[in-house]
Amino acid sequence: MDRITGPFRKSKKSFRKPLPPIQSGDRIDYQNIDLLRRFISQQGKILSRRVTRLTLKQQRLLNLAIKQARILSFLPFTNTESLEKMKARIREARLKAEEVRLKNKEARFKKAKEARNQKKTTFRKIFINPKNSKLNTETNQI
């Protein structure tokens, strides 16, 4: 008895079947660009039946209509607008990464220079002048 009411019991919730992507009034035609654009990916590829939830007959008609629209220049073969946007985003990201890399490099050099300046010590050169036989000293910094 416990197994029936356990966690593996199927729920009896009702669910609503989603509306079909193509209504009965929509006509699949190469001139209906608004309809065709809904079934093309951002890259310009034709979406599969599994994604679009179309029937086999609708998908065949849609493929033919999209191909005709491409040949007649109603639709682009590749969606260049989204490609250009994507390329621009990539370019901006690369520039930003390069700027960050250069800033980090400058910061490392600055830090190293400060460390070198702190490590500088003074030393004395001791030498004997043969003419004076006096002990001369000079202080230098490295």
UniProtKB/Swiss-Prot annotation:
Q: Where is this region: Disordered?
A: 1-21
Q: Which GO terms describe its cellular component?
A: mitochondrial small ribosomal subunit; plastid
A GO biological process held by the record? translation
Top-level lineage group: Eukaryota
Task: Give the main localization category.
Answer: plastid
One of the entry's Gene Ontology molecular-function terms is: small ribosomal subunit rRNA binding
- List keywords of the entry alphabetically: Plastid, Ribonucleoprotein, Ribosomal protein, RNA-binding, rRNA-binding
The residues forming a coiled coil are none
**Which locations, inside or outside the cell, does it occupy?**
Plastid
Q: How does it assemble?
A: Part of the 30S ribosomal subunit.
UniProt similarity note? Belongs to the bacterial ribosomal protein bS18 family.
| Alphabetized PANTHER family for the sequence | 30S RIBOSOMAL PROTEIN S18, SMALL RIBOSOMAL SUBUNIT PROTEIN BS18M
What this protein is called in its record is Small ribosomal subunit protein bS18c
* Gene this chain is encoded by: rps18
